Amino acid sequence: ISLGAPLALYYKNDPNAVMQFVKEEDMASAQAQVKLIPYPQSVVMGEGEVAMGHFTSLVYPSEELRDLAETFANHPTASTQPLLALEQGAPKADAAINLILDNTQADEGYELKVTANTIDIKANGRAGFFYALQSLRQLLPVAVYGATREGWAEWTVPCLTIKDRPAFGHRGFMLDVSRHFFTKEEVKKLIDVAAIYKLNRFHWHL
């Protein structure tokens, strides 16, 4: 086998092999137009981009989604004002991030549409909205995960439409703390990072 050629483990040349080594250029998808992990099922780019300072409110349809809205809208530091006003009700036509219930969406799936006027997120329930907001965060500068969000108003997000749903129902990672110890805060941070990448199972070895 030549250097860099695909090599399947366990069942050579079987497309269902458990693991494959591939050439580095094969790993970078020619389809990737935005930096998102995991990459969505569909990404359609629009024209231009919009600054986050254009949006003044985050509208959510029901009280059970308020905490998701608060987490996205609020600064990480409690001493600062929310970046977006929170409103429960119908979607707004301008300057808003709208969470819109849509029963046609797949379980845990969502549609995220960014235009010059609004960011509309459609999902059939809490999980879909959660994953859509994670994707929206990934479209922003990495500073969105920092202790402050200085420059928020100037941050831009591309105009696009994303349609996505999980390829697998069980998406987990394992942490073995019986061999290498972690503090409670470190474990909580790991869970937060797992959520960024839309993992939904925490396998904990104690």
Give short role names for the model-derived ranges.
Residues P166-L206:
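Substrate-binding cleft of carbohydrate-active enzyme catalytic domains
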